């Protein structure tokens, strides 16, 4: 009886080739997952920046409208959806700042406002499930609201 060592070597080659393939596929999967996660985080930041820019521009336009005597003004700003947990977001309006508070602390941001209007700015809005935010000037106050004003 003669032993065939070539057959055993071939089988070992198949096993090592398979294991090398599994290793390469695992590394590729982890690499793709990292790319996808980084892209999603970048898109979140860009969407939040665009939302904050749109809101601050609407507030500045409302400041201008507040200078007209006996006027009321409302502007709807659409909130772009993000992958972040928006139920953790709170938007606050002060006389000189628009502030986004993230309860997790990762996406906190703020925008400076000119504060040129003589009207006080107020409003705190929870962003859970929000599609649009209203910037309203009525009765001498500029505010953020979720519901369309009825004036």
Across the structure, where does each feature detected by a protein language model lie?
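N-terminal leader/signal peptides at the extreme start of proteins
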Residues: 1-6
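N-terminal export/assembly leader peptides and their processing motifs that target proteins to secretory
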Residues: 29-151
